[in-house]
């Protein structure tokens, strides 16, 4: 692993939406979920920078080029009675992997969580993504085997809401 001294992490700006959107598509292709992506630059801009932002993002630049992003938001733990930081997505472009950028992004987010008084920092990982699981565990994360994600979208969500 070689660290590029020109790598810098900063909060995303509206000018970064195009880069983040393209990396979201790259991530979806990698996760074999590209058929689920309906995100547009306009919707992403609204979610990050609209009147009621739903999330935040940071980007990492190498030699002035945006090569990684992390999108995150706050949740709340009833057990801890503290808010948490939830990492929705972290992505490093294929051409820039193995340089330590992912770990630097995670460490940056961990610092944000501590600075904001969060009781935990969480994210999900696909069970087949062994390299990511190993990476996260090497960073001190506990992969929780007893938990499963429950999700309701589309027509089932509408039916549940009517029900």
Please tell me what each predicted stretch does:
Residues 114-124:
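Conserved GNAT acetyl-CoA-binding A-motif
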Residues 21-47:
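Conserved GNAT-fold acetyl-CoA-binding loop/helix
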Residues 118, 137-146:
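Conserved acetyl-CoA-binding loop of GNAT-fold acetyltransferases
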Residues 46-59:
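A short helix-loop-beta-strand connector motif used in the catalytic cores of GNAT acetyltransferases and
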């Amino acid at each position: 692993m070689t660290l590029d001294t020109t790598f810098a992490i900063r909060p995303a700006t509206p000018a970064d939406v195009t880069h983040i959107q393209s990396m979201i598509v790259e991530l979806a292709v990698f996760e074999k979920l590209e058929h689920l992506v309906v995100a547009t630059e306009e919707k992403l801009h609204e979610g990050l920078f609209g009147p009621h932002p739903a999330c935040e993002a940071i980007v990492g630049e190498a030699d002035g080029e945006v090569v990684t992003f992390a999108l995150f938001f706050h949740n709340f733990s009833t057990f801890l009675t503290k808010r948490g930081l939830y990492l929705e997505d972290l992505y490093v472009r294929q051409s820039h992997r193995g340089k330590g950028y992912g770990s630097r992004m995670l460490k940056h987010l961990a610092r944000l969580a501590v600075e904001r008084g969060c009781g935990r920092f969480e994210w999900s990982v696909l069970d087949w993504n062994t390299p990511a699981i190993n990476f996260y565990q090497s960073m001190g994360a506990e992969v929780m085997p007893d938990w499963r994600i429950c999700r309701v979208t589309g027509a089932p969500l509408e039916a549940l809401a009517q029900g």
